[in-house]
Amino acid sequence: MLKLIVETKTLVQSLGFASSVVEKRNVIPEYANIKLSAKDGNLELSSTNMDLYLSQKIAVQVVSEGELTVSTKTLNDIVRKLPDSELTLTDLGTTGLEIKGKNCKFNLFTLPVSSFPPMDSINPEASFKISCTDFAKIIESTKFSISLDETRYNLNGVYLHIKDKEFCSASTDGHRLSISWVTLEKQIKNFGVILPQKSAEEILKIVKDPKNINEDIEILLSSNKIKFICNENTIMLSKLIDGTFPDYSAFIPESSSSKLVINRKIFADSIERIAIITVEKFRAVKLSLSRETLEISAVGEARGNAKEVINSSQDKESFYEYNSDESLAIGFNPQYLEDVLKAVKSDLVELYFSDVSAPVLIKFPENPKDIFVVMPVKV
């Protein structure tokens, strides 16, 4: 039966990832548990929520091989509260799992391994590797505009697709569109799948982990599943959304009548300040643009009003340039602008306008492989 010795800090991190996968209110006990398998000097931790399956291997001292399942939440809560030290985990059979630390001991109820589902197999139609850094970039640049409307299920995730050596992520909620891509080293079969929001968030946490961020991630695609292999010791398998993502190219403005170039941080900070006055029912800020100034203003029902002026400047730290003699006043949901401005770390941001009712194209000169479209609102 299972017996192993492991460092607390090693176990904490893996349990954190596992706990994040498991649904907090899972009514099926088997899916609320984590499977622990000790073999060949490794502890494999398996967790699932039926749509998503995560397997992690960590190096431990295996005294005796074995496997069991135990409450993910309880085990995670205990280990997180323990000081850094060695832990001994022992399967005591009918009396459960013993967790023994320096000055403490816990006994947890277990369930048989036979009740825990295995990871599904996948027959990949396409597979490739990219750096975790690149993968994190395209997910972070698009995840915030995923639709939360469950009736539009085909928009409830990021659209991962391959076209002509470009690996692209896109998402939209009908009010905004986010697109980010990287170039692959070799030609791969064109493919497109919709990765659910939960799965996108979980794999993003894994690839951004310090031990993974400088490594590659292998991605295997089929029509209904996607498999991620990161650092060889972490495997995530996810179901895909069965739907068709809209042809987003039709929503990208092809022309504009005016262009704003501004310091990203100054613009973002100003919008965030002015947005404080807005109310949830109708969130809108107005941008009043001219060659000389940008005025950002808002009126909040039963709160008051606010205004901030940014002057024309060629200085990099306060850059503002509007290229039209025609002044423009246009409104936006401030959250939509804030999300875009926070997603891409760049000194400057470019906004391309056609008229007050047309969608606005947003680009970053230092990040040409990120494109955003935001619909304006009436103010």
Swiss-Prot record:
Cited SUPFAM superfamilies: DNA clamp
A Pfam cross-reference name: DNA_pol3_beta_2
SMART domains assigned: POL3Bc
Keyword tags: Cytoplasm, DNA replication, DNA-binding, DNA-directed DNA polymerase, Nucleotidyltransferase, Transferase
InterPro entries membership: DNA_clamp_sf, DNA_polIII_beta, DNA_polIII_beta_C, DNA_polIII_beta_cen, DNA_polIII_beta_N
Example of a GO cellular component annotation carried by this entry: DNA polymerase III complex
Chief localisation class: cytoplasm
Compartments (UniProt record): Cytoplasm
Biological processes per GO annotation: DNA strand elongation involved in DNA replication
GO molecular function per UniProt: 3'-5' exonuclease activity; DNA binding; DNA-directed DNA polymerase activity
Stated family: Belongs to the beta sliding clamp family.
Subunit structure: Forms a ring-shaped head-to-tail homodimer around DNA which binds and tethers DNA polymerases and other proteins to the DNA. The DNA replisome complex has a single clamp-loading complex (3 tau and 1 each of delta, delta', psi and chi subunits) which binds 3 Pol III cores (1 core on the leading strand and 2 on the lagging strand) each with a beta sliding clamp dimer. Additional proteins in the replisome are other copies of gamma, psi and chi, Ssb, DNA helicase and RNA primase.
Function: Confers DNA tethering and processivity to DNA polymerases and other proteins. Acts as a clamp, forming a ring around DNA (a reaction catalyzed by the clamp-loading complex) which diffuses in an ATP-independent manner freely and bidirectionally along dsDNA. Initially characterized for its ability to contact the catalytic subunit of DNA polymerase III (Pol III), a complex, multichain enzyme responsible for most of the replicative synthesis in bacteria; Pol III exhibits 3'-5' exonuclease proofreading activity.
Protein name as catalogued: Beta sliding clamp
Organism name: Rickettsia felis (strain ATCC VR-1525 / URRWXCal2)
